[in-house]
């Protein structure tokens, strides 16, 4: 769902990003394919024309937004679980009825235009990923994330999650895992080369948080490939590094 929707694409990098929705192609109205294609083309042309006419404003907005991400001065809170909520409004849409060839008004009573965060985390300075975990290291390499070796310095604290239990949560009509976790100070030792350090002060910093937090709806742990990172009663292998 998240990959197909482009949520790990340009939008999360503070770029002006659009998703143009269309019919799913599963209907039987083949005779309407021309109108559907022309409708898609019209929408795409409108977006391109708008971008061309406002290119200076868009480029400046994107550049300013990306500077905030790279500097680490972005919003310290990151929502890793959210839901669509109602604000009490009803949505009225005027449509043309193919049956009667007249205008008709469709009223959406269960209208949920507000995106409401239900679980936030404070963005850490970065994460420590075990260098021996090939699957995680492959993920880091494929996304070309900025990382370095880590030397434990004064002024930072290291935390590790314990997986207390694993529940479930509805995510846009999909049921995904929702682990209950507890964060505590890391008491182990960190040898040279044991971990790589991925800072959140980089262009893909928000993506890093969404990917590596165990309660994230878009986290790596929601994929079968990384399911072994979550084990009830055990420690989560990725560590959080925060400034004291």
How should each PLM-predicted stretch be described?
Residues 139-142, 148-149, 165-244:
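Catalytic centers of hydrolytic enzymes
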Residues 1-158:
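Hard-cation-handling environments
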Residues 153-169:
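Beta-rich nucleic-acid/ligand-interaction surfaces
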């Amino acid at each position: 769902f998240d990959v197909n929707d482009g949520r790990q694409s340009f939008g999360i990098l503070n770029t002006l990003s659009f998703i143009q929705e269309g019919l799913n192609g599963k209907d039987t109205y083949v005779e309407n394919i021309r109108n559907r294609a022309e409708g898609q083309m019209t929408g795409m042309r409108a977006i391109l024309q708008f971008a061309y006419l406002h290119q200076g404003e868009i480029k400046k907005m994107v550049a300013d937004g990306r500077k905030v991400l790279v500097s680490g001065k972005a919003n310290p809170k990151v929502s890793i679980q959210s839901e669509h909520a109602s604000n009490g409004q009803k949505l009225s849409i005027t449509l043309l009825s193919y049956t009667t060839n007249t205008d008709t008004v469709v009223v959406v009573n269960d209208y949920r235009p507000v995106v409401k965060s239900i679980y936030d985390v404070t963005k850490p300075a970065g994460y420590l990923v075990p260098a021996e975990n090939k699957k995680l290291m492959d993920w880091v390499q494929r996304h070309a994330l900025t990382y370095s070796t880590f030397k434990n310095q004064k002024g930072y604290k290291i935390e590790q999650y314990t997986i207390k239990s694993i529940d479930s949560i509805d995510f846009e009509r999909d049921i995904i895992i929702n682990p209950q976790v507890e964060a505590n100070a890391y008491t182990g030792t960190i040898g040279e080369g044991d971990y790589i350090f991925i800072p959140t002060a980089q262009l893909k910093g928000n993506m890093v948080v969404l990917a590596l937090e165990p309660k994230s709806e878009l986290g790596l742990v929601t994929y079968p490939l990384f399911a072994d990172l979550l084990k009830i009663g055990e420690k989560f292998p990725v560590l959080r590094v925060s400034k004291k």
